[in-house]
Amino acid sequence: MKLCVAFDVASYDECINLAKELKGLDLWVKIGLRSYLRDGVKLLEAIKKVDNFKIFLDLKLYDIPNTMADACEELAKLDVNMFNIHASAGKSAMCMIMERLNALSKRPLVLAVSALTSFDEQEFFSVYKQDIKQAVKDFSKISYESGLDGMVCSVYESLLIKENTSANFITLTPGIRPFKENSDDQKRVADIQCAKDNLSDFIVVGRPIYKAKEPRRICENILEHLK
């Protein structure tokens, strides 16, 4: 299981300072919509210069198939190791994306977002008209059949996805509160042991790290628990 640190901070300088603080640690960096809209490609390049961190670009692309495929080809030109799209875009979009990316000599990992961890069961049903478990099964099936590399999901759907697809189908799980910290705006959260039990491949941790007085010490503690 790998640690992915969410750099969801308020400025470019804070991102770079956090990267410097974590230099040398075996982890991935997640750059989300806020940071990418604010700082763009220069942030990705600057983080790579601090240390050759692997980068997960968390933009959750969602559009018509051709537009998504074009965008994903552009993303593949960036120095990122993984990005995500919404499974709700459907199988046609996912197949087109993977056909384009697989024609390249090198491509990033591509994950599909199932149900945002900010959803509880009631709110999810009001949008999708089915329960989370069934939707995740459906989304994971079409994502796997389309050739994607894995899913973004809550810890509580990780095992379900692997059982429905393959043990090698990646699950990346946000909403991790390593030592049972406050869940903030996340609804379906879990700790490290729960992530281990549910065979998560990546855990995403943000606020418990970047809001800490000693982010490096927190990361080292998490990495020790992942062994």
UniProtKB/Swiss-Prot annotation:
It is an enzyme of class 4 (lyase). One of its GO terms (biological process) is 'de novo' pyrimidine nucleobase biosynthetic process. InterPro entries: Aldolase_TIM, OMPdecase, OMPdecase_AS, OMPdecase_bac, OMPdeCOase_dom, RibuloseP-bd_barrel. Its EC number is 4.1.1.23. Pathway: Pyrimidine metabolism; UMP biosynthesis via de novo pathway; UMP from orotate: step 2/2. GO terms for molecular function: orotidine-5'-phosphate decarboxylase activity. CDD domains: OMP_decarboxylase_like. Substrate binds at residues 8, 30, 58-67, 117, 177, 186, 206-207. The keyword NADP does not apply. The keyword Lyase applies. One of its GO terms (cellular component) is cytosol. It catalyses: orotidine 5'-phosphate + H(+) = UMP + CO2. The active site is at residue 60. Disulfide bonds: none annotated. It comes from the Bacteria. Keywords: Decarboxylase, Lyase, Pyrimidine biosynthesis. Belongs to the OMP decarboxylase family. Type 1 subfamily. NCBIfam families: PRK00230.1, pyrF. Catalyzes the decarboxylation of orotidine 5'-monophosphate (OMP) to uridine 5'-monophosphate (UMP). Homodimer. This is Orotidine 5'-phosphate decarboxylase. It comes from Campylobacter lari (strain RM2100 / D67 / ATCC BAA-1060). The gene is pyrF.
